[in-house]
Regions:
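An N-terminal assembly and electron-transfer interface module characteristic of large anaerobic redox
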Residues: 5-8, 13-194
Length: 194
């Protein structure tokens, strides 16, 4: 079933200034998602969003209860096993408009001491204290143990967010992640943006 919104609607909802009126009446909550951005960055982001083509958001109804689903995580936090190839920070330092468009596979039993964080656009100190901030594997394992989810998938995925040119990410990385999710028979994916 196709979604009724568009990607542009979604981006504008998540980044734009909008009003929320949860109940009829005089109380209105104003949400300004740009409030922490300087004026130049704010204008740049708004111009970038305006240039994005409007596309339908694909939507798939869940076919079974969550308690019967296999669940995986995809994080844009650039999380990688210490034993794996690091994300390319050096090229990004030289060209801040570029980010490594590849991905890393993280096993379900990974712990904080097993991984490193390569995202240059966030303070990863909180994730070093608690991996669940960027890759909530322990939390999901607890839900699995409690019968809230069917099972935690064997493999999870991370890529480096802030990808201004998503061509490689869409054409090369995403199909590989989808193949891995299908191989693990994943029913539900938790997307963890940074």
């Amino acid at each position: 079933m196709a979604g009724t919104g568009t990607i542009r609607d979604s981006v504008q909802l998540s980044l734009g200034t909008h009003r929320i009126n949860p109940q009829p009446g005089p109380m209105t909550v104003h949400v300004d998602s740009y409030r922490f951005l300087d004026i130049v960055t704010r204008q740049m982001v708004k111009a970038w969003i305006a240039k994005e083509p409007s596309r339908d958001i694909p939507w798939a109804e869940l076919q079974k209860p969550v308690r019967d689903c296999s669940v995986a995580v995809i994080s844009s936090g650039a999380v990688a096993l210490k034993s794996d190839t690091p994300f390319d920070q050096e090229t990004e330092r030289k060209n801040p408009w570029w980010s490594d468009p590849t991905h890393r596979v993280i096993p379900r039993d990974a712990r904080g001491e097993d991984v490193e964080f390569y995202q240059l656009h966030i303070d990863a100190s909180f994730a070093r204290e608690d991996l669940n901030c960027l890759l909530p594997l322990a939390l999901l394992a607890g839900l699995e143990e409690g019968g809230e989810i069917g099972r935690l998938a064997a493999h999870h995925y991370s890529f480096m967010g802030y990808t201004l040119d998503p061509t490689f990410l869409i054409e090369e990385t995403t199909p590989k992640i989808i193949e891995g999710l299908r191989n693990d028979e994943v029913d539900l994916v938790l997307l963890v943006p940074t």
